[in-house]
Amino acid sequence: VNKMKYADLHIHSSYSDGSKRPEEIIDSAIKNNIKCISITDHDSIASQYVTKNNYDDLLIIPGIELSTEYNNMELHILGYFIDVENNDLKSLVNELNIQRIKRVESILYNLRKYNINLELKDLEVDNDSTVGRSHIANAMVKKGYFDNYKSAFRSFLVQGKPGYVKGFRLNYRDCIDVINNSGGVPILAHPGQIYRKLEVENILKELKCFGLKGVEVYHPSHTQGDVNKFYNLSKKYKLCVTGGSDYHG
């Protein structure tokens, strides 16, 4: 996105469902003249301990992406400038990790009914990384059940397919509170992906009342029409504007 040419505030590393380690992401950002990044792993702050070093040519903002529940919808909330030593944030992340493992175990149980026999130990997960469907799909390929990741994921792991188990979601108000209380800035991620797009303005109004500070206006999934709409809504409700690539490697 041109307006975010020198910053990328939405990146996933191998500590969640990205393929690159934080060190590789940092090297790539510096080589590509990016001046500011935030690694926003799903439900994880582990990468933040790796990126604490100071770099002359790169500002790294501590970040996270949380999956939340709002009126039976999934909303993703980004948190920037979080204090990774905050006890409430640590407790939240720990609970999310426990729930992720439970979900993965349920998915593996479902897959065994179709003679796809995988165990937790078969999933290649870095220490302190969050485990998820991407790790299962990779294991399905490695064990020879599928030829490629996309086929494995789409055949068994998306909603409506036999391996799917709904993910655990936190209440959106709790997530916004924890981000704010940890010194962070809560941002609504990729609003263009909300399946009831007509409700976005009402969602923004309500979330602002509970402490939302901004909107991810610039995202690869957004059309120019989306960008214009969300930019204008951000200005209308005095919310900050952010953007990022949602890079996974």
Q: Where are each of the predicted segments found?
A:
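An N-terminally biased module of ancient metal coordination in phosphate/nucleic-acid-related enzymes
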Residues: V1-E74, F156-V158, P162, N171-V178, ...
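Extended substrate/RNA-proximal surfaces in nucleic-acid metabolism proteins
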Residues: N53-N202
